[in-house]
Every structure is written in C-alpha cells, then in structure tokens.
Amino acid sequence: MRIAILGGSFDPIHLGHLQIAKTALKKLAIDEVWFMPTFSTPLKQGQQASFADRCFMIKRAIYGYRRMKVCTLEQQLGGTSYTIDTVKRLKKQYPMHEFCWLIGMDQAIRFPDWKSSEELKQEIDFYVFSRGSEEIEVPNDFHKVAMELYDVSSQEIRQGKKLYMLPKSVRMYIGKKGLYI
C-alpha cells in the first residue's frame, strides 16, 4: 500500500488541508492519505489546541472519506516532532507500506531548516502543492503538484477570520469547546 502523509499542526484543520488530501488522492498513485498531527513542533510557536482536540477535529473533518485516516505516531514518539524521526519510525512500524510526504509551499521554502533535511530527502519522496501559476524554488528531487489552493491559514482562523473555511463539524466543535477564544 502507498501512503501519503500530510503532516502539520492542524491547529485547526481547514478546507485547505482537505483540498491537498483530495488532490493527492486524485493526482498521485497513492492508496490513502494519513493526517499526521505534530505532537510538538520545533518551527511553530503559539499552538492553541491540545493534541487530543486537534486529532478529534481531524477525525470530524475527514469523516466519510474512507481513504483518509489520522495517524498519531508523533504522540507515541513524544517530545518535539522531527520529520526524520517520524519517517524512520513509519518505515519500521509499517515495513509493507511505501510512504511519501505532502507539503505546501510554505513548508517547502523552509525545508532547509528542517532537522536532517538532506538525509530526509533520501528517505522519502516529497510532493509540494502549489498554485499552478506560482513559481517557487523547491529543493531538488521534490515533485510539484499544481492545484487550486484556498487562501486560508490556521493562524487566520485562530484569530477569528475566515471561519467559513472550516468544515462545519470542526466549526461546531471549536464553538462547543471554546477553542481559540
């Protein structure tokens, strides 16, 4: 089975994340997309929701998509989440699967800052999702996937903007739990 990993803080998950997963399932030779929420990320500050809340929001957002799953491996690893460690554990824990990693333009640009980025490029294939008209500089050996991207970020949503870019079930959960207020 070929699995595409979509990693991120998903704080909260929004329609842009789902669009990447849907596009990957349509355009790439993959069987499933696994959403991999970071337990603790080294390159972002200001995380608002707990790991459990973020996982629950992902489950609500992907409900009904049988080829999308949540993978909580980074919680099992504990501590700061580094992609190199996650990839090595995935390969060890699921030796019969083949993995690739899905990232957006923002992460592709920051990729040289990732821990062991050169080794990581040897471990797994990366697919960068970008607007078809945008020319971005990405590391060698990365595959570009053009798509219609939504203009939204989780940070904007945490600030109370663009709430319409949340799946309804996630928006209801945020309201019920009083997250990001």
What name fits each language-model region?
Residues 1-181:
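Nucleotidyltransferase catalytic core that binds NTPs
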